[in-house]
């Protein structure tokens, strides 16, 4: 059996997962074309396709994950899960349908009227990451100016923008790492001085969490289950009343040893994914036997 992480670009997280063997099994990294050429029925593939640096879509490779599944490869983080994580409009619709706390979301497109605001909002790309092109608008005039400013961007012309209710910033968020319906790690991300966004790419810093809040973990697991993801980062914001709001999901989440002071986060993640793949293969085999009986 081969275990493969399917990604278009190398990343420190994928390198660390490759080093985290599970018994006699170990991971390798393949791009979508290599995966199609090498993986066969009974192998395992984990989709690690990310959003594009240009913010106008996803890495090219969902087609390969679909073809691998049709071939009999066990695919974790399949095309539907990755799209649901990376497409913020789809994320919002799924979470709303499952009644999981998430900011009110509106889709801005060329020619569509600007909504009437009930409070501050955030404008961001539909396929965004790293805090890039994320704009806070405290009133209707700021929203109009922002939408006028981004209308020439390639990402806006292709997909429009997401306008979301602003969850009042408290200077930090909680990123929970979920693997196979288990919390395997978490960190607080603390915003840089004078910055309301918590992204590390914008100067935010990670703070280890020795004991992730139980409610936050349950919300993160439910969000991962809602989109069908086997490995996902769930960004949570405190709602000011003791609860948590799902801000975003990351289907190609990057993480470090800071995410888990109580165990080796890469070994735990690797083991959780392998066990999930074995469980899924067992269920598929039982279903096939029942059909043949």
Language model: regions and residue ranges:
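A short, polar/charged loop-to-alpha-helix boundary motif
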Residues: 193-201, 255-264
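Protein kinase-like catalytic core scaffold
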Residues: 121, 162, 184-185, 232, ...
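A short beta-strand motif that forms the metal-chelation/ATP-contact edge
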Residues: 42-47, 121-124, 176-178, 242-257
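A long amphipathic alpha-helix within ATP-dependent nucleotide-binding catalytic cores
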Residues: 196-246, 268-292
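Active-site nucleotide/adenylate-binding loops and adjacent lid/helix of ATP-dependent enzymes
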Residues: 4, 80-162, 167, 214, ...
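Phosphate-binding site of ATP-dependent enzymes
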Residues: 136-224
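Conserved N-proximal alpha/beta basic substrate-recognition cap immediately N-terminal to
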Residues: 9-104
């Amino acid at each position: 059996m081969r275990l493969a992480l399917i990604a278009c670009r190398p990343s420190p997280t994928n390198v660390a997962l490759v080093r985290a063997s599970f018994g006699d099994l170990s991971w390798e990294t393949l791009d979508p074309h290599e995966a199609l050429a090498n993986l066969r029925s009974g192998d395992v593939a984990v989709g690690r396709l990310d959003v594009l640096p240009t913010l106008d879509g996803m890495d090219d490779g969902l087609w390969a994950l679909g073809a691998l599944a049709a071939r009999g490869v066990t695919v974790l983080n399949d095309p539907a899960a990755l799209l649901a994580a990376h497409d913020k409009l789809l994320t919002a619709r799924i979470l709303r349908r499952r009644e999981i706390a998430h900011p009110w979301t509106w889709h801005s497109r060329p020619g569509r009227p600007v909504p009437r605001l009930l409070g501050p909002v955030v404008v961001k790309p539909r396929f965004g990451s790293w805090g890039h092109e994320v704009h806070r608008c405290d009133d209707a005039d700021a929203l109009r100016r922002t939408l006028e400013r981004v209308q020439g961007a390639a990402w806006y012309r292709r997909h429009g923008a997401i306008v979301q209710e602003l969850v009042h910033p408290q200077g930090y968020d909680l990123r929970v790492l979920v693997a196979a319906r288990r919390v395997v790690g978490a960190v607080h991300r603390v915003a840089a001085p004078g910055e309301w966004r918590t992204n590390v790419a914008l100067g935010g810093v990670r703070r280890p969490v020795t004991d992730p809040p139980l409610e936050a973990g349950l919300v993160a697991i439910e969000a991962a289950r809602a989109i069908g993801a086997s490995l996902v980062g769930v960004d949570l914001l405190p709602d000011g009343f003791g609860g948590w709001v799902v801000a975003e999901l990351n289907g190609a989440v990057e993480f470090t040893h800071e995410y888990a002071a109580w165990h080796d986060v890469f070994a735990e993640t690797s083991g959780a994914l392998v066990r999930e793949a074995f469980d899924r293969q067992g269920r598929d085999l039982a279903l096939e036997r029942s059909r043949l009986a």
